[in-house]
């Protein structure tokens, strides 16, 4: 497969052109860790294309990605899924859609709602032992769709824990009510490449975002915006310019270009190996003391979530034990620890983690049934009004009846 962005950068770096253009390092700098990177870092010069135009080497590379993912169109983001989410919601604003969203949305969604002055009608998941991860019921979604004309449903799947919603059934339900389904698939970039294609676009979503940098070999900030409904394709780049930097990173775009090659040539075999390694890890003696299964519709296989609470240990205490043994986790709180595998990880990674978990000794404490009751609060103001209002910081135990001014996750 061709790699138009990488090929151009490699050729230009060796061309001998005198660089009378940005960036200021001019393709060279004093000897440091980035000295081999600078020659590939350019701006929109002749023949380098433009991220926000529909021709040139970047557009050619995006077409490769679209073919690999099986979408109507795919666009690159150098601002992570955050930029994709801003763009998708702006497209819904153009379409005069009324936004319904599942409440465990990421802060990037709420920030985009602030910027676009979108008022949200919330669907609340059924939470078990964490407000980060919960099960959304089809009946609750349908109840909202019945009451909302020209609707858009926004849902996060997989969530931070790796738990996945039944996107196929949700897509069918949305389209029955002529609603648009938008999916934050930031944690699910690998989903098209398992034996069963579980990607939101394949399951009927109208658009979604994938954070390539989260689960694939791509630089931080690299993401894909996928379109399943071609009605929205023509406006994506125009809308994206409202939020994106006018100096997009060619290094990040190059990493997406090269990631496409990995996806086409290697990922399916690597994921087969990953699934085998994970299955062996979960069956190992080291995992007998830890609860790792998530009671959900499905779980993204590379998300390795330990329910510390049900394992009889405080999650932050377990996290400290891991760090002491040089394991850096993705996230930890009192009840859970999240660790992320990647298709890049080999057997040594899994063996090392298994050995560390096996070395951790603790006396499990007796746990009571941790059931979170999270009632739907009364709406007092819009998200934008709350974001720009005066606020004060108070202990969470004294926050009953108050308006939340910001989010943390």
Predicted feature locations:
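N-terminal "arm"/small-domain region of PLP-dependent enzymes with the aminotransferase-like
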Residues: 1-56
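Conserved PLP-enzyme active-site core in the AAT-like
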Residues: 5-10, 32, 53, 68-71, ...
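Short, glycine-/Ser/Thr-/acidic-enriched flexible segments
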Residues: 27, 160, 214-215, 230-232, ...
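Conserved N-terminal alpha-helix of the aminotransferase class I/II PLP-enzyme fold
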Residues: 38-80, 104
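Short glycine-rich or small-residue beta-strand-to-loop segments that form or flank ligand, phosphate
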Residues: 48, 75-77, 153-156, 338-340
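A short linear hydrophobic-aromatic micro-motif
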Residues: 73-75, 210, 326-330
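Conserved C-terminal alpha-helix-loop-beta "cap" of PLP-dependent enzymes
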Residues: 286-408
């Amino acid at each position: 497969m061709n790699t138009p962005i990488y090929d151009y950068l490699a050729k230009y770096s060796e061309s001998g052109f005198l660089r009378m253009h940005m960036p200021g390092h001019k393709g060279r700098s004093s000897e440091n860790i980035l000295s081999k990177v600078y020659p590939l870092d350019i701006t929109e010069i002749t023949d380098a294309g433009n991220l926000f135009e529909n021709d040139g080497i970047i557009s050619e590379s995006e077409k490769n990605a679209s073919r690999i993912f099986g979408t109507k169109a795919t666009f690159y983001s150098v601002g992570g899924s955050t930029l994709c989410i801003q763009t998708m919601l702006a497209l819904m604003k153009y379409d005069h859609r009324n936004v319904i969203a599942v409440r465990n949305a990421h802060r990037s969604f709420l920030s985009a709602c602030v910027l676009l002055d979108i008022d949200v009608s919330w669907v609340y998941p059924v939470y078990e032992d964490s407000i980060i991860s919960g099960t959304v019921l089809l009946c609750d979604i349908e109840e909202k769709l019945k009451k909302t004309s020209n609707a858009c449903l926004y849902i996060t799947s997989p969530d931070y824990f790796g738990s996945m919603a039944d996107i196929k059934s949700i897509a069918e339900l949305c389209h029955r009510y002529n609603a648009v389904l938008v999916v934050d698939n930031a944690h699910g970039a690998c989903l098209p490449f398992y034996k069963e294609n579980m990607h939101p676009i394949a399951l009927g979503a109208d658009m979604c975002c994938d954070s390539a940098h989260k689960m694939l070999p791509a630089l931080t900030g690299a993401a894909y915006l996928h379109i399943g409904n071609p009605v929205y394709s023509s406006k994506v780049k125009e809308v994206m310019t409202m939020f994106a930097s006018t100096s997009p990173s060619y290094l990040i775009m190059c990493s997406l270009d090269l990631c496409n090659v990995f996806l086409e040539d290697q990922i399916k075999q690597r994921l087969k190996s990953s699934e085998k390694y994970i299955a062996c890890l979960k069956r190992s003696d080291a995992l007998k003391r830890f609860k790792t299964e998530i009671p959900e519709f499905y779980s993204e296989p590379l998300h390795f979530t330990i329910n510390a609470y049900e394992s009889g240990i405080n999650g932050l205490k377990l996290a400290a034990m891991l760090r002491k043994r040089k394991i850096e986790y993705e996230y930890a709180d009192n009840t859970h620890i999240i660790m992320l595998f990647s298709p890049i990880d080999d057997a040594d990674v899994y063996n090392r983690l298994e050995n560390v978990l096996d070395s951790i000794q603790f006396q499990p404490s007796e746990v009571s049934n941790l059931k979170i009751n999270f009632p739907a609060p009364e709406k007092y103001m819009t998200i934008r009004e709350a974001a720009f209002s005066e606020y004060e910081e108070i202990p969470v135990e004294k926050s009953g009846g108050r308006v939340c001014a910001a989010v943390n996750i």
